[in-house]
Amino acid sequence: MDTISENKCFGGTQGVYSHASAATGGTMTFGLFLPEEAANGPVPVLIYLSGLTCTHENAMTKSGAQAFAAEQGIALVFPDTSPRGDGVADTDGFDMGLAASFYVDATQDPWKPHYQMETYITRDLMQALADFPLDMDRVSITGHSMGGHGALTLALKHPDMFRSVSAFSPICHPTASDWGQRQFEGYLGSDKSVWADHDATLLMRSNGYDKPVLVDQGTADQFYDKLNTGDFAAACADARADAQIRLQSGYDHSYFFIASFIADHVDFHAQALYA
């Protein structure tokens, strides 16, 4: 583990760290906010997965989440959105390759050697976090857009790992979206039954979910037609999930939207983490 930076923030520390990952075959970077309570013992954890084109920095510097996490005594983790470095496959587009992993474990070349992001988040990152004063029995997850897709699918697939899940503007039904179909074929191959294991709507339909769910979606989101929020809401209703799906009038897909409602999400997770 290498320390890249540490800065005092809302009485705690905002750090940036790098570590070796067996899953991605390279060095990964993440941000970690530790509230001041961490000086006295382990604190609960909220992981934030960012969206397309992002790094670990975007939510760390734009969401304002640290202020509300400090009030609740919760740590925040900001992972990167893909592997990086020499030899890591990429495309010219913004929606596949670097910063566009869709948080899946790729099975197809040229992606397979490094794009093992589900394993990275659920194994390697968790192992790295064990070096810090964190209560790894109390972990929740959130995310935005592609990261919202990642948060929902990882929570649905690993229900014992996360106590609650939330998302801003998530890609809710990627197997039925331009944001998902091409990427899944590239990363996972042409077998659509494999795709279903990475689709929040289909996972909710098939498995249900017994932990709290919160989704915020802006009505002025310029990518609304790609996100299929209604499909996920219907799946939650059919599964009788403990889910709040909120449409926020006039809000778009930007970090201004996230900053407007991040306090609600931190409070939502605090209820589950301290239950």
Residue ranges, per PLM feature:
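Non-catalytic cap/lid and distal C-terminal segments of serine-dependent acyl enzymes
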Residues: M1-A275
